């Protein structure tokens, strides 16, 4: 055997060309076998595999980890061909039995996954037809429904899915990171070359351009083609004096229902739907119809002709719902046209709602807010002033949590946002261990982190307010709780201090979308009070100190709900 091997080596040393030829043939044959196994090993998806619920569902934990967590929303229509292929997203990939795995062969799984990815992308394209590149403008949007931004992870599919979920017919992307939805395109198309910006979260894909929208028409599922998301009940209100000016669009509906009126106003792209018996009125919240003086709901308790368990209001008292249409009157934002002559701080203890207040200020003034720090996650969510140096003078105010004398005296004026310390400490703890809108894990609350956090941060809550009251040059105190309760008045005070003319219609627009995407969900709450008796005793003493300091300056003391606990 050794002699045979030696002769074999000597032969190829003398004939190197033959050796490399033989090697190339060997590799080619191996590749063909590999490709063949990939095509032959790809199984068709049976009915039960396409719908795991029908088959009893997959085993727990069988989902493949490499697929990520994006799921195809119910807004898209499931095409007939979809049942014959495996999707990249959702539950169809969960669990494969031993026989199916055997069909894939040793290498077939990897190859067929790549093949399926290509096929599924083609199927996804059938659910959204590309229309073209369109002109867009902050003053006159091409698509006037909801919008959302992500300057880090935006993809075409994500935008389409979000718009389809809300029942919109069109979805468009621009600046590589901004997604807009609408029921009709209200702009002219331009050259395809002008949509030239790559998606932030999808290399090789185009997501519009500078003030240019890449627009897609969405193929909606039958059940969502007339669904426009959940309308928000605003209350019962007296008929406005000048109805045609307050609510400019009206339709008579003999078979009136809440859905019909909401759908009608959504199609007309108005954020308010007002039911008045057999009449449906659409419009915006304005000074003529501000939605501030709610009436007793019994005054609107007239049954709908098409839905006996719904109230449709009367000709004198309207039932009002807020549709999913975004009020764009307060969405335009920009940097200050010239360098500001004064630096105004938006000062707060961490967890007191500073990010939310920035969102409100930007909507109310139309100018970006800045920050003493730099938070990339906030910049990616649309706070474009986050990247500017805090002394640039291009932003309307500056977020800061600082409380030293030197840092405070660097500002010419300040809005001091104060929040209940019990709520603020928990919010900051959640942010520290769960992100801006996330939550700390149960282990963090039960571990040593929480007691140590309270011990270090509770004194800071008091000294932060006391320092700003002592060293601040011109301080406007705003309580977080008052801002939530009476946003129109409190935000108006804040805008006045910033030196911007208060536009009431713009403040009403802010009221309709006050939460934005920067508010932690209230659905997840601790099932117990994390504050021990000793913690409560210490914090109550700090509350009394702050209350006395406020009253000593002829200001309103802390709200009553700060104590007792």
From Swiss-Prot:
Pfam families xref list: WSC
First-listed, main subcellular location of the protein, grouped into a coarse class: Golgi
SUPFAM superfamilies in the cross-refs: P-loop containing nucleoside triphosphate hydrolases
Transmembrane regions listed in the UniProt entry: 19-41
Segments forming domain WSC: 127-219, 230-324
Glycosylation sites: 189, 242
Parts of the chain on the Cytoplasmic side: 1-18
GO cellular component, one term: Golgi membrane
SMART domains tied to this protein: WSC
UniProt-listed InterPro entries: P-loop_NTPase, Sialate-O-sulfotransferase, WSC_carb-bd
Entry GO MF terms: sulfotransferase activity
UniProt KW Transcription regulation keyword: no
Cell compartment(s), UniProt: Golgi apparatus membrane
Membrane-protein topology: Single-pass type II membrane protein
Alphabetized UniProt keyword annotations: Glycoprotein, Golgi apparatus, Membrane, Repeat, Signal-anchor, Transmembrane, Transmembrane helix
Topological domains annotated Extracellular: 42-565
Similarity comment: Belongs to the WSCD family.
Biological role: Sialate:O-sulfotransferase which catalyzes 8-O-sulfation at the Sia-glycan level using 3'-phosphoadenosine 5'-phosphosulfate (PAPS) as a donor, forming 8-O-sulfated Sia (Sia8S)-glycans. Displays selectivity toward glycoproteins such as TF/transferrin.
The name this protein goes by in its record: Sialate:O-sulfotransferase 2
């Amino acid at each position: 055997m050794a002699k045979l091997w030696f002769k074999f080596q000597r032969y190829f040393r003398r004939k190197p060309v033959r050796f490399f030829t033989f090697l190339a043939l060997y590799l080619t044959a191996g590749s063909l076998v590999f490709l063949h196994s990939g095509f032959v090993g790809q199984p068709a998806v049976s009915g039960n595999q396409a719908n795991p619920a029908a088959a009893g569902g997959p085993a727990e934990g069988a989902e493949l980890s490499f697929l990520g967590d994006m799921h195809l929303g119910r807004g898209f229509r499931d095409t007939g061909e979809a049942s014959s292929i495996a999707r990249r997203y959702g539950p169809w990939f969960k669990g494969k039995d031993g026989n199916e795995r055997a069909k894939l062969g040793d290498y077939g799984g990897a190859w067929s996954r790549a093949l399926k990815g290509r096929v599924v992308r083609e199927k996804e394209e059938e659910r959204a037809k590309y229309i073209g590149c369109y002109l867009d403008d902050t003053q006159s949007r091409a698509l006037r429904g909801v919008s959302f931004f992500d300057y880090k992870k935006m993809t075409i599919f994500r935008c389409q899915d979000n718009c389809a979920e809300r029942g919109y017919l069109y979805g468009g992307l621009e600046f590589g990171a901004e997604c807009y939805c609408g029921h009709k395109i209200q702009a002219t198309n331009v050259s395809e070359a002008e949509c030239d910006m790559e998606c932030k979260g999808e290399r090789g894909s185009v997501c519009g351009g500078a003030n240019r929208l890449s627009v897609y028409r969405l193929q909606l599922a039958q059940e969502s083609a007339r669904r426009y998301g959940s309308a928000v009940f605003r209350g019962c209100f007296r008929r406005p004096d000048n109805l045609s000016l307050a609510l400019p669009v009206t339709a008579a509906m003999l078979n009136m229902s809440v859905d019909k009126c909401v759908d009608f106003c959504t199609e007309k792209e108005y954020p308010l739907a007002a039911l008045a018996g057999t009449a449906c009125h659409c419009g915006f919240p304005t000074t003529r119809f501000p939605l501030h003086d709610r009436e007793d709901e019994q005054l609107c308790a007239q049954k709908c002709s098409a839905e006996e368990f719904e109230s449709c209001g009367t000709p004198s008292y309207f039932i009002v719902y807020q549709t999913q249409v975004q009020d764009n009157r307060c969405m335009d934002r920009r940097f200050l046209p010239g360098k500001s002559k004064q630096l105004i701080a938006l000062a707060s203890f961490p967890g007191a709602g500073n990010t939310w207040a920035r969102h409100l200020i930007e909507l109310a003034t139309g100018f970006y807010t800045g920050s003493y720090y730099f938070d990339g996650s906030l910049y990616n969510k649309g706070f474009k002033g986050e990247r500017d140096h805090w002394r640039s003078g291009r932003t309307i105010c500056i977020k800061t949590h600082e409380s030293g004398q030197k840092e405070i005296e660097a500002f010419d004026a300040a809005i001091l946002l104060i929040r209940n310390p019990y709520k603020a400490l928990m919010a900051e703890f959640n942010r520290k261990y769960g992100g801006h809108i996330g939550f700390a894990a149960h282990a963090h609350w039960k571990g040593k982190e929480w007691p140590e956090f309270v011990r270090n941060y509770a004194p800071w809550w008091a000294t932060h307010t006391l320092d700003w009251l002592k060293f601040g040059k011109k301080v406007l105190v705003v309580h977080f709780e008052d801002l939530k309760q009476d946003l129109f008045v409190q935000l108006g005070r804040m805008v006045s201090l910033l030196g911007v003319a208060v536009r009431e219609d713009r403040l009403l627009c802010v009221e309709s979308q006050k939460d934005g995407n920067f508010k932690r969900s209230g659905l997840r709450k601790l099932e117990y009070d994390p504050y021990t008796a000793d913690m409560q005793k210490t914090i109550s003493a700090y509350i009394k100190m702050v209350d006395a300091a406020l009253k000593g300056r002829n200001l309103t003391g802390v709200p009553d709900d700060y104590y007792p606990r």
